[in-house]
């Protein structure tokens, strides 16, 4: 009886970990000269809404001279592949 319960517990724990992945796509700018970029970054599960993700991403981006303009959306790992080409060098960089 203990083995099936343990197996189910492990499966549920692993499924919960996978579901907890959260990503945000965003637009940033840098002045002088004006440079605009689109990117994708992972954010913590607790910040998996556009407003909360903005609060997490803004300091990361600012430390490299970028100003966050907007967080377009938040999504799970299923949305990564379709955004990879558009994000280019800003794919999971920050």
Give the role of each language-model region:
Residues 2-94:
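Terminus-proximal functional modules
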């Amino acid at each position: 009886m203990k083995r099936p319960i343990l197996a189910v517990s492990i499966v549920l724990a692993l499924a919960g970990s996978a579901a907890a992945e959260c990503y945000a796509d965003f637009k940033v700018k840098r002045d002088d000269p004006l440079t605009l970029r689109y990117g994708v970054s992972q954010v913590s599960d607790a910040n998996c809404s556009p407003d909360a993700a903005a609060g997490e991403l803004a300091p990361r981006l600012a430390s490299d001279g970028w100003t966050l303009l907007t967080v377009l959306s938040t999504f799970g790992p299923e949305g990564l592949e379709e955004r990879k080409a558009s994000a280019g060098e800003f794919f999971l960089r920050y």
